[in-house]
Amino acid sequence: MTLFAYFSSSLQPGSRLSYAQRAMVAVLCVMPFTALAQDTADDGSTVIYPAEYFTEWQPITAQDMLARIPGQDASGPGRGGGGPPGGFTGNPTRGGRGLGAGSSGTEIMINGKRTAGKNQSASSLLGRIAASQVQEIQIIRGTSGELDVRGSSQVINVILLEELSSSSISYEAAVNYAQDDTINPGGTVALNGQRGSFDYLLTLRSQPRYSNELNNESSILGDFSPNDTVIEERTRDGENNELSFNLGYAFTDNSRLQVNGLFAQRDAPTDVERVTTDLRTNPVGLLVEREALPNERDNWEFGGDYEYTFANGARFKLLGIANHDDNASQRQRFQRFADNSEELNLFLDTKAITEERIVRGSYTFDLFESQSVELGMERAQTTLDSKLQLGSLFGTGAPNPAVGGLPNVRVSNANSVVEEIRVEPFAIHNWRINPQLTLESSLLYETSEITQSGDVSNQRDFDFIKPKFDLRYDITPTFQVRGTIERIVNQLSFADFVAANDDQDNDSNTLAGNANLRQQTQWRYSLNSEYRLPNDVGVLSAEFFYADHEDVIDWLDVSTSETNLVSVNGNIGDGVEYGANLNASIRMGMIGLPNLLVNSTLNVQDSEVMDPFLGIERRFRFYQRGRFTLTTRHDIPQWRFNWGIQYFDRIDGGMFMYDLQDFEWTVGDPFHGVFAEIRDRRGITYRLDVRQTSDGAQCRERWRFDGRLSDGILEELEYRCTHGGVQPSFTVTGTF
């Protein structure tokens, strides 16, 4: 008997729970439960939530509707459910690349179509669609050749009303508070509607990306005598200004075109104030520094998706995107003297332009009554044009006006163009073996050529065969088991090919690039179970996974001499990872609170790889051992009010980083958040959100060694903590 079959059998009318069963219930959902009558329809492996299901909560947007469905709190931070803050995400090794790769998680579609773009997610679009335009929300747990996505554990399909003419305007105005008493306003306005065969969504957004961090660092020398202390304030005055559009036009009942675009300005200038106290002298010495880090970043994206359905039900689809990201930044470091004068001692200028062009075509047809096949090809071109210039007061080169008049410092691999051309033919077969059992199998053949020119010239060819099998068995309409086997080729970061700014270490200016980096690949095996409790009480799910990795990317020794020790991101060998994810989303009707939705997640995982410096088995770099999340949403419809909490905590003590001369491990305080939301009679929502109710310190311990890490000669031990402070915000949202 499987885990969830055993569990579900204990919930039949008249049954009694044994002590073992009670323990299992406690592990999976921390509480018992009873039925809650709600109006939902179950169509095989698809659960349908009509618009009437959400009436009592008076939602404003489609995102508000989705947040009320057990197991589907995809609202993200600031909209009631909340995803974890930065640094709390889990597995860093998952995910393929290209437009056809499924997320292995939850995909969101609108009217059966996904967004033809990478910088615009369908989940963010839900916050701009009025709830009055939603006909129903479908939770699709099966797989089919008719779906517009592949490989996802489930699909959320938001069906909009078909009206000849309709439109709505949604708006959001917000103010955010930072711990340095800075208040930053922002806002979003969106127009969405339909005119006959034409539908549209236009969005104008201006959001602050302001942050203020206080860093405290203390260090001792290798003989455990005091070394220094560092107090640093880092203020980033970032912004995110966007203009985006999503357009769709149905030429006929069987021919449709979707187009989307995005123009964005994401500048993030940063100022740093730093005071270093030298404890090795008497009296102590003070070094006061200021850093100015101007940053300008602009990007745009266009995407298109055309689909034609033939009379026999076969479909032709053509999809393409093009995007451009221009990121220019500088790092200027000044020493401030007692008379308040300053001297420039470091100037680092980096420019990076990243471009991507992808086109994908496919033809889907029925092979037999219960089988369909999709044949197609994808071609992608990705380029990075990177330039870096370094000037230092202590350099030996000639003064250069381009680096603030400082002596020029030569940096290896500082100016390069990296290009990848990838071609990927594929075949996908969907087979409904019987009403309860489906199998999706795919075979992709990837060929790619990576060339690098400039300071380094290199050209390499790669090819990978990527099969995947996804078997789903609906034991009952509410209980599904899913097993997958797939080979994944992880996307390379082209920034690892070239020299770059080192913003994690004040004692280092640049990171070296590696022109010989290869893709990290993995064979991944997973077993998933999902049990939907009767009468929409909630959802329980579990995933167990194991992965064999090849060419794991981590720090690699490329030193040419013992006096010039250098490490780069490189391929260090093979590794494994394994773990489990347990999820519960329960309505608390058993305690008289049917409108209290509790979501909890427990992730436990581990990994192993051979360390190239010490020759020992250890975890992947900064690999989380696990995490626990708990979020709640309590609706009080008669007051038009809801509130909730957010809690995220990692399993600390296991996140390590081994480098050629350093060793680091990180720990952090749990994240606590709380929100409250009230709606007036006009339908305007007022929301107070506190994303961090405590200090939320994230700490790092770094061991520096004299020479190689393997020599074991400790030079310095640093302990550094970053404090982000309480982060409240106030938001007003409405539609008309």
Locate predicted features:
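N-terminal periplasmic accessory domains that precede
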Residues: A62-M65, G95-G98, I108-M109, L125, ...
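Outer-membrane beta-barrel signature, preferentially recognizing the C-terminal barrel domain
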Residues: E291, N295-N299, A352, V418, ...
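Extracytoplasmic beta-strand/coil segments of soluble accessory domains associated
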Residues: Q38-T40, Q63-K118
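C-terminal beta-signal and adjacent terminal beta-strands/loops
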Residues: F4-A5, I651-F656, A676-F736
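Gram-negative outer-membrane beta-barrel transporters
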Residues: F545-D548, V568-F656
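Short acidic/polar hinge/loop motifs at secondary-structure boundaries
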Residues: T115-R141
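Face-selective signature of the C-terminal outer-membrane beta-barrel domain
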Residues: S244, G248-R266, L293-G454, N458, ...
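Transmembrane beta-barrel wall of Gram-negative outer-membrane proteins
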Residues: Q179-L214, S225-V272, L293-R315, F469
